Amino acid sequence: MMKVLVVIALLVTLISYSSSEGIDDLEADELLSLMANEQTRKECIPKHHECTSNKHGCCRGNFFKYKCQCTTVVTQDGEQTERCFCGTPPHHKAAELVVGFGKKIFG
């Protein structure tokens, strides 16, 4: 029983010490990461826009991040080119439909 109390006291001391030491660093790190996230959000590619040159730059949707979906387009000259756009994959659409339906039923 005494060992358990000593271990608990040691853990409480370590947690309080580490949290007091790192609060200022944590706040600065959080601020920098929030600023980076805002910058990333501004630069992401919206749904239905072309992502051929940046296949990992699609924005987030309601529940999931949009995926860059590519198709091969054949021109009248017979040339094949790849065209990509940001969109919601079918399995994500199904999940969003189920969640939306569940929200309507259960409030």
Curated annotation (Swiss-Prot):
Propeptide intervals in chain numbering: 21-41
Tissue: Expressed by the venom gland.
UniProt keyword terms in alphabetical order: Disulfide bond, Knottin, Secreted, Signal, Toxin
Pfam family, one: Toxin_35
Compartment annotation: Secreted
Superkingdom of origin: Eukaryota
Keyword Secreted: yes
Signal peptide location: 1-20
Main location: secreted
GO annotation, cellular component aspect: extracellular region
Keyword Disulfide bond among record annotations: yes
S-S bonds: C44-C59, C51-C68, C58-C86, C70-C84
Molecular functions per Gene Ontology: toxin activity
Entry's free-text remark on domains: The presence of a 'disulfide through disulfide knot' structurally defines this protein as a knottin.
Entry similarity comment: Belongs to the neurotoxin 19 (CSTX) family. 04 (U1-Lctx) subfamily.
UniProt protein name: U1-lycotoxin-Ls1b
